[in-house]
Amino acid sequence: MGMTSDSIANLLTRIRNALMAEHLYIDIEHSKMLEAIVRILKQHGFVAHFLVKEENRKRLMRVFLRYGEDRRPVIHALKRVSKPSRRVYVSAAKIPYVFGNMGIAVLSTPQGVLEGSVARAKNVGGELLCLVW
């Protein structure tokens, strides 16, 4: 079981490395889970946009990264919380507020992949996938 068996950790690492190298986008193997996470990142202004494309019978997701006026990444940190080796579940009441509410928590819930404040409002908990700020 290498690193790549954790596709979410792989996504976060690929984004982190691409931002440090000032790349415009990353291409990553598509999955519904990863698309749901990236869609939340886009809604909260952490990535510019994304698209899903077929290439050599493989579905790829291209994620366009976002930089501020000063060419600095708008993302300061991406932290994987729950891991295949150690799952982390939280109730709605225990969903963390991230970085003075400037960041987000992403959860996998019975109602789908949700951002923390949305899950809190719906009063659903779930697996705490990652934190972004």
Curated annotation (Swiss-Prot):
GO terms for cellular component: ribonucleoprotein complex; ribosome. SUPFAM superfamilies: Ribosomal protein S8. InterPro entries: Ribosomal_uS8, Ribosomal_uS8_CS, Ribosomal_uS8_sf. GO terms for molecular function: rRNA binding; structural constituent of ribosome. Keywords: Ribonucleoprotein, Ribosomal protein, RNA-binding, rRNA-binding. GO terms for biological process: translation. Part of the 30S ribosomal subunit. Contacts proteins S5 and S12. Belongs to the universal ribosomal protein uS8 family. One of the primary rRNA binding proteins, it binds directly to 16S rRNA central domain where it helps coordinate assembly of the platform of the 30S subunit. HAMAP family: Ribosomal_uS8_B (MF_01302_B). This is Small ribosomal subunit protein uS8. It comes from Chlamydia trachomatis serovar L2 (strain ATCC VR-902B / DSM 19102 / 434/Bu).
